[in-house]
């Protein structure tokens, strides 16, 4: 067979892989092969392109790997959803489109780790800005010419967004006008990755659209990576399968580096399948050990969240939009004008608070939604309602990813070990009680009806714990399973290079050493922008001097 050679092979066309593909091919002499196990991002499919349809891709298998965890021991042994994006755009093709970067202190904390000194907020902010075009223009914190379109909430959006923010302020928490600006702490409007024409701004739309016409970029969809090929400790290529036929094995060789961007679930899985991981485990799976690296698949983290739902006394919620007979008009307005309910992910307000003084920066996140429904579109309440999604941000619980089979189409064993520490339970109890306090402020008096969920009869610690155990769900933020650093459990260095190997990097949410305070997509893109400059041998962007808020 005719084996082609490229300067770089990127595994996974997701939030990070597409950034690398676009940036590396800006150098006209650099050839790149981008491998994606899923299909194209079909632009005529409203399920991925219409922001308000965000629940649809999670219900199917075309765009979602639809992993399930092992029974979670502290969650009544539930097997919990772990949706991950499949197709050009990866999880940016199916996520909730919240543009939230996390707290500056997250990055300051990363930078205290040996080898990560250049991951401070000042080092990273220029790369957040480089990636972004914000619809109201740039400033010290925001970009105005990047590939990711960011939309800000507009006047005239749902009255419940404003009432919920006002209630948070009345409950004694700060107000902030920009959750990605000087001060994350507090309640305020939430930005979203949506284009000016009301379309989802995935990294396929942002980055690949500007790169896919380049002769030095080859994009293969329906190409599932079997393993990375090595000559001793040097990555020399990738073996992959086209379509669903395991006999249809292809190989591509690499001159410079293999860049693994398959995400926090699949990146450790591919490393293990390729012989890089904990040696005793690899031998037990009958895999030849290329390199003993015990941290591969360890340190897995996620955000867990729950919904607090209320009836709405006035007919101002989005409940009518769930009725089939109202949807054609909503769809038409979105399709032809790029406006209306269809053009928003409906997460237009939220916030970050500290549930107690033991935390130096926020540990609880809120997303407000002007309808009562599950994130994946199930269990909609059959009347006007609204809800707060609330969860803790930096749980001490740690999980792991383990291969179950050498079959490249088999899902791995995933265990997040949710709620395994006393801090977890304390934070979730506090979150429920604080949310109830917020919901009972005067700003919500005209709207707030009875509490639907958890239900006001649940009051004791034991009752609240039981609710969390049975009803908390993932926020779809798996991360940290191939962490950056220099300690014995680190998988990559501060530039994403796999320890002990040559010509191999991991660049995606798996390399975060600690999960951030907020949604992951914006930071995953930033990481890829930053490492792209390092791969290209370019000088880092000048450090930012923009200040950030630290609670006294």
UniProtKB/Swiss-Prot annotation:
Say which domain of life the source belongs to.
Bacteria
Tell me which residues this entry annotates as catalytic.
477
Spell out the disulfide connections: none
- The catalytic activity of this protein is classed by the Enzyme Commission as 1.1.99.1, 1.2.1.8
Catalytic activity as recorded in UniProt = choline + A = betaine aldehyde + AH2; betaine aldehyde + NAD(+) + H2O = glycine betaine + NADH + 2 H(+)
UniProt pathway annotation: Amine and polyamine biosynthesis; betaine biosynthesis via choline pathway; betaine aldehyde from choline (cytochrome c reductase route): step 1/1
Q: A Pfam family in this protein?
A: GMC_oxred_C
- Tell me which UniProt keywords the record has, alphabetically: FAD, Flavoprotein, NAD, Oxidoreductase
Is Cell inner membrane included in the keywords of this UniProt record? Answer: no
Listed GO cellular component terms? membrane
| Cofactor(s) in the UniProt record | FAD
Q: What class of enzyme is it?
A: oxidoreductase
At which positions is FAD bound?
7-36
* Any one GO molecular function term: flavin adenine dinucleotide binding
Its GO biological process annotations read: glycine betaine biosynthetic process from choline
Q: What does this protein do?
A: Involved in the biosynthesis of the osmoprotectant glycine betaine. Catalyzes the oxidation of choline to betaine aldehyde and betaine aldehyde to glycine betaine at the same rate.
Member of which family? Belongs to the GMC oxidoreductase family.
Q: What is this protein called?
A: Oxygen-dependent choline dehydrogenase
Which species expresses this protein natively? Acinetobacter baumannii (strain ACICU)
Taxonomy of origin reads: Bacteria, Pseudomonadati, Pseudomonadota, Gammaproteobacteria, Moraxellales
């Amino acid at each position: 067979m005719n084996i082609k050679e490229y300067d770089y092979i990127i595994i996974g066309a997701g939030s990070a892989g597409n950034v690398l593909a676009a940036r590396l091919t800006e150098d006209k002499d650099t050839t790149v092969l981008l491998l994606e196990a899923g299909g194209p991002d079909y632009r005529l499919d409203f399920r991925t392109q219409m922001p308000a349809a965000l629940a649809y891709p999670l219900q199917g298998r075309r765009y979602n790997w639809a992993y399930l965890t092992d029974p979670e021991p502290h969650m009544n042994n539930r097997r919990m959803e772990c949706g991950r994006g499949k197709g050009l755009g990866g999880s940016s093709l199916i996520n909730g489109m919240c543009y939230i970067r996390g707290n500056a202190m997250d990055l300051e904390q990363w930078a205290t780790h040996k080898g990560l000194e250049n991951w401070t907020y000042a080092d990273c902010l220029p790369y957040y800005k480089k990636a972004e075009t914000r619809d109201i223009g740039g400033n010290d914190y925001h970009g105005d010419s990047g590939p990711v379109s960011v939309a800000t909430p507009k006047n005239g959006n749902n009255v419940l967004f404003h009432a919920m923010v006002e209630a948070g302020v009345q409950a004694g928490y700060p107000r902030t006008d920009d959750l990605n600006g000087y001060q994350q702490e507090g309640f305020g409007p939430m930005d979203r990755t949506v284009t000016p024409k009301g379309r989802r701004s995935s990294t396929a739309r942002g980055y690949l659209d500007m790169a896919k016409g380049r002769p030095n970029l080859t994009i293969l969809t329906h190409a599932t990576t079997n393993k990375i090929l090595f000559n001793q400790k040097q990555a020399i290529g990738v073996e992959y399968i086209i379509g669903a036929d395991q006999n249809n094995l292809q190989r591509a060789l690499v001159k410079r580096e293999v860049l693994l961007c398959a995400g926090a679930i699949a990146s450790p899985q591919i490393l293990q399948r390729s012989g890089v991981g904990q040696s005793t485990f690899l031998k037990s799976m009958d895999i030849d050990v290329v390199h003993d690296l015990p941290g591969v698949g360890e340190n897995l983290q996620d955000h867990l969240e729950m919904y607090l739902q209320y009836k709405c006394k006035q007919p101002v919620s989005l409940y009518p939009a769930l009725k089939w007979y109202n949807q054609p008009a909503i769809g038409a307005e979105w399709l032809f004008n790029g406006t209306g309910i269809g053009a928003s992910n409906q997460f237009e307000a939220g916030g970050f608070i500290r549930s107690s003084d033991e935390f130096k920066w926020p540990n609880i996140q809120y997303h407000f939604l002007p309808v009562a429904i599950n994130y994946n579109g199930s269990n909609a309440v059959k009347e006007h309602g609204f809800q707060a999604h609330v969860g803790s941000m930096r749980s001490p619980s740690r999980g792991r990813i383990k291969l179950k089979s050498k079959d490249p189409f088999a899902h791995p064993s995933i265990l997040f070990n949710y709620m395994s520490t006393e801090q977890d339970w304390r934070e979730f109890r506090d979150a429920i009680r604080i949310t109830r306090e917020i919901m009972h402020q005067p700003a919500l008096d005209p709207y707030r009806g009875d509490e639907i969920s958890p239900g006001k009869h649940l009051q004791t610690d034991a009752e609240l714990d039981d609710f969390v155990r049975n009803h908390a769900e993932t926020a779809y933020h798996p991360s940290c399973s191939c962490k950056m650093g220099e300690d014995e459990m680190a998988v990559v260095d501060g530039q994403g290079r796999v320890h002990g190997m040559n010509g191999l990097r991991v660049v995606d949410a798996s390399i975060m050493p600690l999960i951030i305070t907020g949604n992951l997509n914006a930071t995953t893109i930033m990481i890829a922008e930053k490492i792209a400059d390092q791969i290209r041998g370019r000088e880092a962007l000048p450090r930012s001097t923009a200040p950030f808020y630290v609670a006294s």
